[in-house]
Amino acid sequence: MNKTAVQAGAYLHHLAFESSNPARLATFYSNAMDMDVTQLSHSEWRCEGPGRRMIVVPGTDKQLAYAGFACRDQAGLTALRLRAQQEGLEILDSPSPYFQPDAFALCDPNGQTLCFGLAKLAQNHRAGL
């Protein structure tokens, strides 16, 4: 059966933004949203808190690098990949560090990258409500 993202149980898991000053943007969101910020390399900052994650990478201000949609189970992810293949969409490697290895990405008609995968277990140490 061809499933849409909603039928496959996909939900917005995280966002990745571009910035001409990634450290400044990551620090802003860390402070504004009470998230831990970690610089993983010269090209990646992660902001994490209970139920919220974002990535900041070097690039053009006000640009979405990609959106990460997590599927609730392997069957949903498999169904989404199959539908994308049947629709003739190019399947790309997922740039998301938050998904398991079988994740994939697609580009929408505007060139925005959408990632789909199964979420890895959360690594942040802040307590949720």
Language model features by range: what are they?
Residues 75-82:
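Short amphipathic alpha-helices within nucleic acid-binding modules
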